[in-house]
Amino acid sequence: MWLTEAQKFGVAFTFGGFLFFLFGIFTFFDRALLALGNILFLIGVFLIIGSQKTYIFFTRPNKRRGSLFFLVGAFLILLKWTFLGFIIESLGIIGLFGDFFGVIVQFLRSMPIIGPILSHPAIAPIVDKLAGVRVLPV
């Protein structure tokens, strides 16, 4: 399945939002970088999945708390309460995208350098529990 031009821009915006958010954390919770990261991330999600699916995703009954926390955190960041806003927004991100952590862990395990580390018998159960990966007993 190939991406449309809008979806390609959406991936770029989402990645840019992630980078600005990360730079905002590295610069001791710089309000402008965190806010720009939030805006770019939301625009990217909107471009990737479309307006109707974005609305449906953020208003699902099991995602409403995460959406509320994300928006309240972003609002607090704009009101110069950056650390508290970051904490609340992080809880919202976990609430919204926590279902994808298992997929991300499985993808990272297929990578050359980090894969063996995540698959190590001492580390794998901890990572599986944190990511919510269900392992069959067989």
Swiss-Prot record:
Principal location: Golgi
Effect of residue 73 to S: In got1-1; loss of function. ER-Golgi transport defect
A Gene Ontology biological process term: endoplasmic reticulum to Golgi vesicle-mediated transport
Recorded superkingdom: Eukaryota
Any one Pfam family match given in the protein's UniProt record, by short name: Got1
Alphabetized UniProt keyword annotations: Golgi apparatus, Membrane, Protein transport, Transmembrane, Transmembrane helix, Transport
Keyword Kinase: no
Residues that span the membrane, as ranges: 9-29, 32-52, 68-88, 113-133
Any one GO cellular component localisation term in the record: Golgi apparatus
Disruption phenotype: Lack of GOT1 is lethal in a strain lacking SFT2.
Membrane topology reported for the UniProt record: Multi-pass membrane protein
Lumenal compartment spans: 30-31, 89-112
Location of this chain's protein in the cell: Golgi apparatus membrane
Cytoplasmic face residues: 1-8, 53-67, 134-138
PANTHER family assigned: CGI-141-RELATED/LIPASE CONTAINING PROTEIN, GOLGI TRANSPORT PROTEIN 1-RELATED
Role: Nonessential protein required for the fusion of ER-derived transport vesicles with the Golgi complex. Can be replaced by SFT2.
Family per record: Belongs to the GOT1 family.
Official protein name in the record: Protein transport protein GOT1
Native species: Saccharomyces cerevisiae (strain ATCC 204508 / S288c)
